[in-house]
Amino acid sequence: MSNNSRHYSAIDEAILQGQAMLETLFGKPVAQRENPAKGLSQPALTSAEKKQSIGFMRVNHSGEVCAQALYHGQMATAKNPAVRALFTTAAKEETDHLAWCQERLEELGGHTSYLNAFWYTNSFLIGLLAGLSGDPLSLGFVEETEKQVEIHLADHLRKIPSSDLKSRKIVEYMQQDEIQHGLNARSSGAKELPYLVKKLMAFHAKVMTTLAYWI
């Protein structure tokens, strides 16, 4: 039985969330959809271009680690089963992104961020707080998060080497999914967040993207 169709005790929920964290941080994510870059040939990148692609794909991978944590935190505190189901579906699609980014990093010879455990823990707590604020604000948090992520991905598409078609194709697909997640949240009753909260979210994202690019 799926975990969005029954009630779990606090202990059950803690075990499920702990398992999700371990799978995200230490497991090998399995995508339900085919990698959009499959079939594209490996580009001939200079060392500088490869370093640049690795940096951006590492940022994107860490972003997906954060997305998993946020959604799981929100799932744990969602009041409405329909809202919880929406978070569950989005988290599954974000798992595809996680798998695609990790696969591309491995192809490029790069490593994932050494700070992913911190990103996950921090984002999970934020997700819990968002969920505890009520479903409308929690959905508003998703809408604003996805809006900011879409902007980051658009920026990456301007900076990833034009010859790195594999990385670019993955980012393009991710961008479309993020836009749809935001639209789904809005249509499900998202409430707009206060201006200060949006600015704090943008600051948090800036710290993550800056550090994850290098570490």
Curated annotation (Swiss-Prot):
Please write the reaction equations for the catalytic activity of this protein.
Answer: a 5-methoxy-2-methyl-3-(all-trans-polyprenyl)benzene-1,4-diol + AH2 + O2 = a 3-demethylubiquinol + A + H2O
**GO molecular-function terms, A-Z:** 3-demethoxyubiquinol 3-hydroxylase activity; metal ion binding
Q: Where does Fe cation 2 bind?
A: 94, 146, 178, 181
Where, per UniProt, does this protein localize?
Cell membrane
Is Heme one of the keywords UniProt gives this record?
A: no
Which EC number(s) does UniProt give? 1.14.99.60
Q: Which UniProt keywords apply?
A: Cell membrane, Iron, Membrane, Metal-binding, Monooxygenase, Oxidoreductase, Ubiquinone biosynthesis
**Which leading EC class covers this enzyme?**
oxidoreductase
What pathway does this protein act in? Cofactor biosynthesis; ubiquinone biosynthesis
**Protein residues bound to Fe cation 1:** 64, 94, 97, 178
Tell me the first and last residues of the signal peptide.
none
Give yes or no: UniProt keyword Oxidoreductase: yes
A GO cellular component annotation here is: plasma membrane
Write down the Gene3D superfamilies for this protein, in alphabetical order: 1.20.1260.10
Q: Choose any GO biological process term that the UniProt entry carries and state it.
A: ubiquinone biosynthetic process
Tell me the membrane topology, using the record's own terms: Peripheral membrane protein
What's noted on cofactor binding?
Binds 2 iron ions per subunit.
Cofactor requirements of the protein? Fe cation
Family under the similarity heading: Belongs to the COQ7 family.
As for what it does, the entry says: Catalyzes the hydroxylation of 2-nonaprenyl-3-methyl-6-methoxy-1,4-benzoquinol during ubiquinone biosynthesis.
How is this protein named in the record?
3-demethoxyubiquinol 3-hydroxylase
Q: Which organism is it from?
A: Coxiella burnetii (strain Dugway 5J108-111)
Gene for this chain: coq7
